[in-house]
Amino acid sequence: MHALLLLLLLALGSALRSPQPPEARAKLCGHHLVRALVRVCGGPRWSPEATQPVDTRDRELLQWLEQRHLLHALVADADPALDPDPALDPQLPHQASQRQRRSVATNAVHRCCLTGCTQQDLLGLCPH
């Protein structure tokens, strides 16, 4: 009888509990995004297994980061208001068309900067 009463109280308590609010979105751009990714994803250099050989996927990620591809992607997706207007420089018609194509193609990094990311969104960007 006591077990049934306890079970009923637990069910009632969980039914009365308010639903959890949606996860907060934070606008993350540039180095703030990189810091958040390192915090959420971690990496082989920060993990306890740092003495073990680096996994192939992690090695590729480290090489990618060292070659500054991530920084290039962040700059490419930066706010167009921060870039000089390519229309003012007649010597750069090719770069202007590239910028227009880049602005059309949105990616996760761009979305994090413009509309914000949740922790779950950041986890989706982790390589492992």
Swiss-Prot record:
Keywords: Cleavage on pair of basic residues, Disulfide bond, Hormone, Secreted, Signal
Main location: secreted
Keyword Manganese among record annotations: no
Signal peptide (residue range): 1-15
Any one GO BP annotation for this protein: oocyte maturation
GO molecular function: hormone activity; protease binding
Disulfide bond entries: C29-C113, C41-C126, C112-C117
A Gene Ontology cellular-component term: extracellular space
Chain residue ranges for the region called Disordered: 81-101
Protein's cellular compartments: Secreted
Family: Belongs to the insulin family.
Known role: Seems to play a role in testicular function. May be a trophic hormone with a role in testicular descent in fetal life. Is a ligand for LGR8 receptor.
Subunit details: Heterodimer of a B chain and an A chain linked by two disulfide bonds.
Protein name, entry field: Insulin-like 3
